[in-house]
Every structure is written in structure tokens, then in C-alpha cells.
């Protein structure tokens, strides 16, 4: 079995990273493909009280266990299975359970900080930056955090102003320079997604 093709999809919070990843996933139904979310690799905080966990800046590179994520990608590159963490966003720590991920022909890694670490970045064969206006991103973030993560409107807005926006300007936006491809307007850009899928199919054909 060949080494998996690693595709990294990044961009600001609410930019449409997951939508692009899912669109690529669904456009390649005949191939073995899997998606890994960087959010699963937030550091374990079970040793902290809940009131301490909520103070963590989850939009900073240090919030992620990048060493573990890189190790897992290396194992997948060797066609070995991994035990991917499962993160509990209401309790702000990892669950005891994990998800077994087997190596596939195509592994999509999606997250806000996947281009920040050089070792992790160098493992990615294709690096995509999803570029979406800030006002669209904050609306999507509010909707997601309230509907899927049990957050209040006040807490989401406060977090955006104090950590999310500063982190985007300091870390996420500068990492755009490492991307091979920049997709404006995220999941709404079907033309860009179609081009990406065609490129992936070409790579697969060249390796077969």
C-alpha cells in the first residue's frame, strides 16, 4: 500500500474548512478517504477544574497537542492505525474513549493551526487555505458554538473579541503564505472544489 496522500485544509474559524473537506470527501466516493479534525487534538485538561479549563485560549497553537497529531500522521504514513482522541467541548477536555482511524489512500487534516508547526506542515502534500470574510466567519462561529457546543451568545462573542480574532491575525492569517492553494468563499466556491478534486484524482492516477 502506498503512503497516504495528506491534504491539509486550514483557514480562520468559521471559514468553511469543514465544508470544503466534506465536499472533497463526497466527491471521491470510490476512493478510501478519511477526515481528521485538529480540534480532536486539543490538550487533555482532565487534571484541571472546569473553571480553569474555560480560561484556556483555544485559539492559540499551544492549545493543541501538536506532537501527538504529528506522531499520528507519521504512523498513518507508515500505514499503521491510530487511536484518535475524542474531545468533549462542553467539559473542555478529552473523553476517555478514542476513535480508531485506519490509513486510507487520502487523509484530510482540517484545522486552524495545521500550517503553524513546521514538522506538521511538511507532512502535508497539498495545503489549502480557505479565505472567507471576517463577518461571515463570526456568524458561523456563533451558530456552531451555540448549536453544537452548548455555548451562550455572550460567551462566544467575548471569546471572539479576546482570543479568536487576535489569534487569527497573529497566527492563522500569516500562515496563508504556506498554502499551495487559496480558496475564497469556502464551501460556496464549487469551481475551486472541482479543481481540487481533479488534482487529487490526477495524483492518485500517477501513483497507481
UniProtKB/Swiss-Prot annotation:
Cell compartments where the protein resides: Cytoplasm
Pfam families listed in its UniProt record: PRK
Pathway: Pyrimidine metabolism; CTP biosynthesis via salvage pathway; CTP from cytidine: step 1/3; Pyrimidine metabolism; UMP biosynthesis via salvage pathway; UMP from uridine: step 1/1
GO terms (BP aspect): CTP salvage; UMP salvage
Keyword vocabulary terms for this entry: ATP-binding, Cytoplasm, Kinase, Nucleotide-binding, Transferase
Catalytic activity: uridine + ATP = UMP + ADP + H(+); cytidine + ATP = CMP + ADP + H(+)
GO molecular function terms noted in the UniProt entry: ATP binding; cytidine kinase activity; uridine kinase activity
Positions of ATP binding: 11-18
Top EC category: transferase
Family statement: Belongs to the uridine kinase family.
Name this protein carries in UniProt: Uridine kinase
